[in-house]
């Protein structure tokens, strides 16, 4: 078996020799985590080559590529404008966004590379170890293993809530910050918990007007900016954006309402007739109509924080907005890059650079932490003991499904879809045993119908057999 990559010209550009695939796909960092820590947690591994590396390495991660992915997950990821989603069923990771990783129960973060780029390490993660692994070219590569010093378990609790309809009106970076403070639920909780508005302290450091002004001043030979329309004539455009960031912040490039169009037929004809067109531009003009997906977004310290935009001609997931993470910086960030990798015509409803200060982060995480013991996940069951100082909505960071049922101290409890994709139950003050069990929705009815079908088939067989013998 050979794993390979085909470039735009239909030429094999990268391959892994048969028999070597497992060496490349098996992550030595994950192996060490599994050996050293037997508790329950998730891992995020950036720049992994395989889609379902969690299955290969037998460890829970935040990456998934399944055709049966819950719509709750894909819809929430799109609402949060996660830049690392690709089609509705493929979430590569959580794009190093500290809050999302915290709420998903991520305890360890791994990155490959020849150097430690601190901007690709989320807030609160400390270097634990440096290991050696195999790169895709079969040479040795480094894996840096980080541990979340503020890690929440897969179970945490809220004192307050907000309705999802109110949450939907927030910007994606404020949505993430809101979930660190209060639970997001679908409906009014009728007095079980107090409704509250989250505190949002994000700061827009470059708005669309300033951003477009910076693009116009660049005067690149392969880019033209007219009004809000950006035309990339050929190749890739990489533009430095200088700004005054905020210290102790996670910085994001937020692009909303992405609209991409191929070159018009008139433009193509005009360009191909021109005598001064370069060979590279000619190739890009000819190939442009075949572009169905490409990257655009941010670059920081030569690390790409891009979004894989899909046109309507590809496996389109409908996402037209993205939040690209420039990373956490202890000092204020002064410059980052914006890039568009495909020739064509771009417009954006909004494009801005936003800083999310982490000043209150430790306080939020501390408040979410519960006294949880004996947390166990086995097959279709989850159980744990919780000691609560007051009434809480206890969130379990496992994907919500109608197939789950819950009990508190042996009595049935209502499951509340929490934060768009997780499960929650409301429990009063005191010591409690929380249990979840899962049965595939429709399994009982399906089994009954299958059994009925077999009984009918057998009955008909017996009837026809008797008639035949009688005749």
PLM segments and residue spans:
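Active-site-proximal, structured, solvent-exposed surfaces of multi-pass membrane proteins
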Residues: 202-471
């Amino acid at each position: 078996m050979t794993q390979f990559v085909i470039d735009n010209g239909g030429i094999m550009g990268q391959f892994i020799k048969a028999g070597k695939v497992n060496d490349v796909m098996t992550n030595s960092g994950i192996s060490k985590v599994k050996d050293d820590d037997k508790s329950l947690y998730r891992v995020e591994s950036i720049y992994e080559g395989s889609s379902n590396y969690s299955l290969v390495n037998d460890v829970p991660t935040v990456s998934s590529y399944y055709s049966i992915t819950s719509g709750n997950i894909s819809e929430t990821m799109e609402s949060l404008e996660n830049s690392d989603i690709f089609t509705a069923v493929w979430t590569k990771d959580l794009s190093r966004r500290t809050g999302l990783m915290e709420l998903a129960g991520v305890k360890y973060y791994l990155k490959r590379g020849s150097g430690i780029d601190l901007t690709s390490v989320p807030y609160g993660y400390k270097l634990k170890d440096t290991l050696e692994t195999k790169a895709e070219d079969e040479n040795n590569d480094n894996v840096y293993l980080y541990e979340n010093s503020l890690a929440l378990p897969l179970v945490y609790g809220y004192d307050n809530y907000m309705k999802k309809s109110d949450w939907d009106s927030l910007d994606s970076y404020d949505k993430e910050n809101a979930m660190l403070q209060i639970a997001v639920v679908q409906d009014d909780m009728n007095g079980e918990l107090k409704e509250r508005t989250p505190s949002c302290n994000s700061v827009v450091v470059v708005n669309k007007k300033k951003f477009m002004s910076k693009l116009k001043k660049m005067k690149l030979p392969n880019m033209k900016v007219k009004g809000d329309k950006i035309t990339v004539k050929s190749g890739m455009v990489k533009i430095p954006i200088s700004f005054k960031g905020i210290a102790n912040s996670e910085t994001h490039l937020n692009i909303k309402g992405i609209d991409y169009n191929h070159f018009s037929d008139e433009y193509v004809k005009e360009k191909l007739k021109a005598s001064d067109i370069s060979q590279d531009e000619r190739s890009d003009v000819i190939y442009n109509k075949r572009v169905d997906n490409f990257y655009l977004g941010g670059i920081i310290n030569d690390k790409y924080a891009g979004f894989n935009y899909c046109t309507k001609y590809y496996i389109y997931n409908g996402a037209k907005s993205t939040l690209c993470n420039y990373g956490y910086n202890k000092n204020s960030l002064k410059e980052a890059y914006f890039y568009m990798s495909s020739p064509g015509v771009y417009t954006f409803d909004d494009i801005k650079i936003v800083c999310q200060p982490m000043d209150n982060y430790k306080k939020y995480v501390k408040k979410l932490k519960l006294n949880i013991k004996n947390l166990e996940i086995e097959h279709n069951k989850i159980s744990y003991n919780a000691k609560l100082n007051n009434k809480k909505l206890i969130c379990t960071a496992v994907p919500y499904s109608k197939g789950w049922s819950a009990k508190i101290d042996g009595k049935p409890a209502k499951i509340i879809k929490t934060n768009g994709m997780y499960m929650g139950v409301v429990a009063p003050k005191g010591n409690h045993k929380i249990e979840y069990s899962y049965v595939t929705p429709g399994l009982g009815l399906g089994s009954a119908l299958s059994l009925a079908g077999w009984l009918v088939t057998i009955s008909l067989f017996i009837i026809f057999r008797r008639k035949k013998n009688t005749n």
